[in-house]
């Protein structure tokens, strides 16, 4: 069976979980066509991402002429389907964040993608994120293409539910994937009970090799925070917590691994609080470099304000590192307070500082016990082969149902 993965930007530094999923599906025997709207010129640091870029077709890279010709061809050869897809695009634009011309462009992109899918013999399209890629997949189906599904990761999708038309996308999809029970609950709120059965939880998973490193916590005083430097990850609160620790003469260092739009603000706050001796920012890192930082660290700290379920938490737990994080979204489904680390209320710098101090004051034996429990927990819940098998069954069922409806 051949499927297509449709993503707005792929590969991307923060989208390693999509790459991991695609490769696991291929090991399960599926053929996967990679299609990305844009991103062929993204800055990439990981060799695996560079290899994926070479396997990916980029819609906008084809140019306006190719897209226009594909649109004209679809309008002439399948006028009824094109009219239905156009009506659907107009409906999606009615309350959308972006204006009508964007949605007409999504329709044009869908026309080109439809041609590619027919040439490749694709039986199902899966979009990652409930944003424009899911709308394009929906329009491909409306044009007469294969059934589609999409994964909602959060948190951005949940911030813009009406603007993204998530409810309409769910109603038209063969199925929808949520990466946590919390995520599923938010999607259930959007649609009638008749559609609830199509919303399935498939957790992101780690590779078998991610579980093979055996390294317990030693006497390190370094705390590691991995993630895009942005408002939802809560690094500004982490700097405030670090200030409290420094003022109390607590011995620690903090490594911020990542980059993003708040880097300048975070760096300014570090300077304002005179924390340069305690905190450093590395910028973007490869998967191997992230792993190295986690192994050198005492614990992962991720003080998120909004999340889906961060893959880096899984990676840290697989390396037997305790996790300090927040009671947000899917995080408590994986991390249990006092068992695998510490959970605190989001936005509470005092509670975060207290949790970090408890971690720093804990004996290595206690941290090692937490690390082993974390390892067992993530291994039981987040193996990529299990996730790929779940997805494969869903893809096959969706394609089978589509064939039955066509013959019936």
Where are these regions (language model features)?
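A short, well-ordered alpha-helix in the C-terminal region of glycosyltransferases
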Residues: 278, 366-380, 387-393
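Aromatic "clamp/platform" in nucleotide-sugar-dependent glycosyltransferases that forms part
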Residues: 305
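Short hydrophobic beta-strand element within catalytic cores of glycosyltransferases
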Residues: 322-325, 335
């Amino acid at each position: 069976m051949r499927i297509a993965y449709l993503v707005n930007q792929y590969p991307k530094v923060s989208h390693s979980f999509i790459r991991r999923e695609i490769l696991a599906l291929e090991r399960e025997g599926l053929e996967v066509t990679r299609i990305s709207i844009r991103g062929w010129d993204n800055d990439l640091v990981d060799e695996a991402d560079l290899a994926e870029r070479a396997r990916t077709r980029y819609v906008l890279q084809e140019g306006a002429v190719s897209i226009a010709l594909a649109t004209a061809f679809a309008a002439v050869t399948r006028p009824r389907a094109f009219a239905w897809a156009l009506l659907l695009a107009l409906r999606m634009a009615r309350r959308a964040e972006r204006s009508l011309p964007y949605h007409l462009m999504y329709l044009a992109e869908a026309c080109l993608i439809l041609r590619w899918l027919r040439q490749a013999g694709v039986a199902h399209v899966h979009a990652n994120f409930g944003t424009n890629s899911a709308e394009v997949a929906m329009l491909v189906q409306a044009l007469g293409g294969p059934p589609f599904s999409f994964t909602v990761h959060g948190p951005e999708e949940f911030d813009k539910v009406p603007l993204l038309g998530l409810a309409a996308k769910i109603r038209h999809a063969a199925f929808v994937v949520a990466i946590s029970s919390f995520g599923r609950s938010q999607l259930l709120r959007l649609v009638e009970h008749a559609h609830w059965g199509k919303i399935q939880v498939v957790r992101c998973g780690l590779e078998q090799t991610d579980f093979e490193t055996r390294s317990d916590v030693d006497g390190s005083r370094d705390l590691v925070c991995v993630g895009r430097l942005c408002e939802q990850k809560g690094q500004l609160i982490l700097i405030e917590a670090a200030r409290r620790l420094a003022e109390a003469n607590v011995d620690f260092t903090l490594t911020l691994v990542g980059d993003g739009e708040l880097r300048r603000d975070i760096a300014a706050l570090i300077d304002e609080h005179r924390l340069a001796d305690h905190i450093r920012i590395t910028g973007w890192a490869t998967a191997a470099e992230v792993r190295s930082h986690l192994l050198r660290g005492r614990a992962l700290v991720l003080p998120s304000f909004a999340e889906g379920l961060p893959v880096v938490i899984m990676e840290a737990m697989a390396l037997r590192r305790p996790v300090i994080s927040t009671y947000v979204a899917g995080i408590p489904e994986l991390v249990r307070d006092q068992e695998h680390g510490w959970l605190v209320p989001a936005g509470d710098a005092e509670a975060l500082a207290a949790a970090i101090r408890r971690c720093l004051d804990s004996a290595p034996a206690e941290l090692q016990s937490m690390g082993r429990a974390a390892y067992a927990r993530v291994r039981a819940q987040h193996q990529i082969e299990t996730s790929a098998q779940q997805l494969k069954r869903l893809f096959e069922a969706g394609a089978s149902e589509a064939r039955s409806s066509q013959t019936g």
